[in-house]
Amino acid sequence: EKYSDYKAGRKKTPEELSEQFPYVKKLLDCYGIKHYELKNYEADDIIGTMSKEAEKHGYEITIVTGDRDLTQLVTNQTTVALTVKGVTEIEYYTPNHLSEKLGISPSQITDLKGLAGDASDNYPGVSKVGEKTALKLLNQYGTIENLYEHIDEFKKSKMKEHLIEDKEIALTCKNLATIRRDAPLEIGLADIDFAGK
């Protein structure tokens, strides 16, 4: 585990939910909806790897999720449909929408999490740096790495002190937030064809 506190804030999956998984899998099978799991990999990594493979084959992809982390997968071929209020309100993330909403590109989502943190994933980020400040820094420097290359140019301030003190935390959080797109999947695109009616 790269960051010892990672996932510490997450509650363990409730037993009553775990007990339902076999039934959910059977139900998905009945409807011809494919499912897949890979030991030591998160669902995000499987989705990231499979969407990259689908893009190579020219597919248009829509990822439906309630997890904002997946917006880093947005491309001209991949849209992330983020459920905002259950499934009654859905926000469609494209590169343009992300740029209009936050002023950053999909590749900067992990930089944003590295600087501002993310309470839902227990990423602390840099002390006293919120989303607004992080976005301003990313608009100016592009990436966390580039920001730290120019840290000596910052005027003396509390923010500069926090950035220097929390450099390793920022880089670790960025790394943890990065969805792997090279998971060793044992399935291909043909294996996830919808088989239902």
Stretches with model-predicted labels:
Residues E1-V64, L70-T94, I169-G196:
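Noncatalytic, basic helical substrate-engagement surface that gates or grips nucleic-acid strands
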Residues P14-L17, T88, L102, P124-S127, ...:
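Hydrophobic alpha-helical scaffolding
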Residues V87-S120:
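A short, charged helix-loop
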Residues S105-Q108, A116-N175, A183-E186:
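Accessory alpha-helical DNA-binding modules that contact the DNA backbone or grooves
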Residues R68-D69, K132:
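Alpha-helix/helix-capping structural signal
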